[in-house]
């Protein structure tokens, strides 16, 4: 019998969807019916994982744990219970065991913030990327379309043999204004590449993390 919980809140759903665009993944344990979400980051992002756990706590039964991976990499992770709503998302986001982008993707500011905290990077003052190299070009173009629908213009940028999404300079003010309320304290360094500006951001940031509730 599947160990499922009740319906997802809109906030929980947004965090899960943002995670699926980034580093999160869904899986169905053999012999079970419903999917679960696994959140797995480096130990250096412990505060961020703890925040995700706090926001998804009603879906979980175990606290985040440290885990040593290949090459001595230290990860920090947790998983949710199995959930029928996660199974619906699994069917949208996975084909033949590979993560894909559904044509119906619609973004909001929380999803965008989670996506950026998971897989975003900023180099210099106007080079902001979503590192979507895991997805096909066709799937990345779906993301570009979804971003445009919320007023964020972007394009594909070649990264060696792969491609990733680059936020256009003209859209950076809106992009950062949209995600800023939801970026947790420990991840605010991604909001500014300049070390002095980064320090100021950290000093001015709220002591409490955004609860989204």
Language-model features, listed with the residues they occupy:
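Internal intein/HINT superfamily modules and their associated LAGLIDADG
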Residues: 1-213
């Amino acid at each position: 019998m599947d160990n499922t919980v009740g319906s997802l809140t809109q906030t929980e759903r947004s965090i899960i969807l943002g995670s699926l665009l980034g580093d999160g993944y869904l899986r169905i344990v053999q012999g079970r019916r419903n999917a679960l979400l696994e959140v797995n980051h480096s130990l250096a992002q412990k505060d961020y994982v703890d925040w995700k756990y706090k926001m998804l706590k009603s879906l979980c039964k175990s606290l985040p744990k440290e885990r040593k991976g290949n090459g001595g990499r230290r990860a920090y992770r947790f998983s949710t219970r199995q959930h029928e709503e996660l199974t619906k998302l699994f069917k949208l986001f996975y084909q033949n065991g590979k993560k894909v982008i559904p044509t119906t993707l619609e973004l909001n500011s929380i999803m965008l913030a989670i996506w950026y905290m998971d897989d975003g990077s900023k180099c210099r003052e106007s080079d902001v990327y979503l590192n979507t190299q895991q997805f096909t070009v066709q799937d990345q173009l779906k993301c570009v379309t979804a971003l445009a629908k919320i007023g964020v213009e972007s394009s594909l940028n070649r990264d060696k043999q792969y491609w990733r999404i680059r936020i256009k300079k003209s859209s950076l003010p809106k992009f950062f204004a949209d995600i800023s309320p939801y970026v947790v304290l420990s991840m605010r360094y991604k909001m500014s590449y300049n070390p002095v500006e980064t320090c100021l951001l950290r000093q001015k940031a709220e002591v409490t993390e955004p609860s989204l509730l």
